[in-house]
Each structure stands twice: as structure tokens, then as C-alpha cells.
A protein has these predicted regions:
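Hydrophobic alpha-helical bundle cores within soluble ligand-binding/oligomerization subdomains
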Residues: 1-141
């Protein structure tokens, strides 16, 4: 089979969108979240610190971080109907498929009337997304 050469088509040099959240290749390479290099965040910051940074616009101080971690922990319980759906997903399913299905089911169980509570919904999703894996390894009851 002949190797296919990559063409020159694409978005090279084109602005695809603007956001305050992240930049990709602003200085030629790399990724930043709210001005922080992703490699530094990956090495030194906790998941909750990066989530707080993305959602609130700044890295949390220790008090803000403690409050945010406690808030996320308080939102981790899963409705039984969601647990039932997740348990029926094949063990070999791709994690993104599991998250999509879980998110869709949770959206049917915890209905949003409008966008006024979007920050709370984001925090809820951040709290519950890791739980399917934890349930599989029986860390949680």
C-alpha cells in the first residue's frame, strides 16, 4: 500500500475561535489554561485546582480549594437509576462512551429548566464522572 502524503490543507494560520480558557500553540507550541502552561499544571496542580482555574478564572487559594474539594465530594452520590444504567454498560466500553451515556442519563434525571444553574451542573458533572471507574474497582459501596 502506498503511503499517503499529508496535504497542506487545514487551518494553519487561521483563527478557529477565541476563548479566555486556553491557547494552543500561541508561541508556536504548547497548551495553556488561563495563561498557565499545561505541563506545569499537570506536574504541580491537583485536578480540582485546574477545574477551579478553568471555571472561576484563577487558581484557588488554600481556603477556596478546601471549600471546592468539599463541595465536589458532597455532589458525588449517584441516583440509583443512573447506577443501574452504568452497570448495564459492557465492561469493555470506551470511557468516553460511558461518560456520554452517564451524562445523558443524569440530564434526564436532574433536569435543567434554564442556564441559571450551569455552574452547579458543571460541578455536579465533575463530581460524578470519575465514579463509574471507582464503582468498577469497588472503592465505593
Amino acid at each position: 500500500m502506498a503511503e499517503k502524503k499529508l496535504g497542506g490543507a487545514g487551518l494553519r494560520g487561521q483563527v478557529a475561535g477565541e476563548t479566555a480558557l486556553c491557547t494552543v500553540g500561541k508561541t508556536g507550541t504548547g497548551l495553556t489554561y488561563r495563561g498557565y502552561d499545561i505541563s506545569v499544571l499537570a506536574e504541580k496542580a491537583k485536578f480540582e485546582e485546574v477545574a477551579f482555574l478553568l471555571l472561576r478564572g484563577h487558581l484557588p487559594n488554600q481556603s477556596e480549594l478546601n471549600d471546592y474539594v468539599n463541595k465536589i465530594k458532597s455532589l458525588r452520590s449517584l441516583p440509583q437509576a443512573l447506577k443501574d444504567v452504568l452497570e448495564r454498560i459492557p465492561a469493555g466500553a470506551h470511557p468516553m462512551d460511558v461518560m456520554r451515556t452517564g451524562c445523558s442519563m443524569l440530564g434526564n434525571l436532574e433536569i435543567e429548566a434554564d442556564f441559571s444553574q450551569q455552574d452547579e451542573v458543571i460541578d455536579r458533572l465533575l463530581a460524578v464522572f470519575p465514579l463509574h471507574h471507582l464503582l468498577l474497582v469497588q472503592v465505593l459501596p
